[in-house]
Amino acid sequence: MINNITVSGNVTRDVEKRGTVDKPYITFGLAVTEYKGNGEKSPMFYSCIMFGKRAASVADYIQKGTKICVSGQLASDNYTDKNGLEHTGFSIKVNDLELMSAKREQESRGW
């Protein structure tokens, strides 16, 4: 079975660097605008995790507001919020990441 997703959107929080020097990984949030057939749009939110040396090297270029495109494996996550309500969220184990614009570039262009 093939499980692959490719989406582009805006990073919702600054990257968190984790792991060790030998096994680094990063986590970040991604908001993707979903366009519906009737002209409405709504956001989809994903938690993202990326492993390896490439993750460590791109971490310094990604911050809240950066527009990126990611490809990876989609997973659903069940969690309980602070009010005790059950929710299902989605996460992406990122295999490939492309910077579409840096936050500084967006600000200079007035995006």
Q: PLM features: what roles do these ranges have?
A:
Residues 51-87:
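Beta-rich strand-turn-strand
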Residues 41-54:
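Disulfide-stabilized netrin-like
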Residues 6, 12, 25-27, 43-45, ...:
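Short coil/loop residues immediately preceding or within conserved phosphate-binding loops
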Residues 5-13, 30, 64-75, 94-97:
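OB-fold and OB-like beta-barrel modules that bind single-stranded nucleic acids
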Residues 1-5, 15-23, 36-41, 56, ...:
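Acidic, gly/ser/pro-rich intrinsically disordered tails
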Residues 27-32, 47-50, 90-93:
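Short, acidic/hydrophobic/Gly-rich beta-strand patch recurrent on exposed beta strands
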Residues 31-35, 80:
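A generic structural motif
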